[in-house]
């Protein structure tokens, strides 16, 4: 029996469950959204949407 467990994470941009992408601090960005963010021009209307979504990613506090 070959049982593969795939963990899905909720993308902070599209709010969909995906299993491929990157983690930034405590948030997840799916591969599709990562590619869209990288290829979007600053003059594109979608750029403001991506910036707003990415601003929800905060650096976790550092405790000593």
Curated annotation (Swiss-Prot):
Q: Which GO terms describe its molecular function?
A: metal ion binding
> What are the names of the required cofactors?
Zn(2+)
**Variant or mutagenesis effect after changing residue 11 to A:** No longer inhibits sigma-G
Q: What induces it?
A: During sporulation under control of sigma-F factor.
Q: What does this protein do?
A: An anti-sigma-G factor, prevents premature activation of sigma-G factor in the forespore; overexpression leads to 1000-fold reduction in spore formation, spore formation stops after engulfment. Overexpression also inhibits sigma-G transcription activation activity. When both Gin and sigma-G are expressed in E.coli Gin inhibits sigma-G, strongly suggesting Gin inhibits by direct physical interaction.
Subunit architecture: Probably functions as a homodimer. Interacts with sigma-G factor, recognition occurs via the first 71 residues of sigma-G.
Protein name as annotated:
Anti-sigma-G factor Gin
Which organism encodes this protein? Bacillus subtilis (strain 168)
């Amino acid at each position: 029996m070959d049982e593969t467990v795939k963990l899905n994470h909720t993308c902070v941009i599209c709010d969909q469950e995906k299993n491929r992408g990157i983690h930034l601090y405590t948030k997840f960005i799916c591969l599709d959204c990562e590619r869209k963010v990288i290829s979007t021009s600053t003059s594109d209307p979608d750029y403001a949407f991506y910036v707003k979504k990415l601003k929800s990613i905060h650096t976790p506090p550092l405790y000593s």
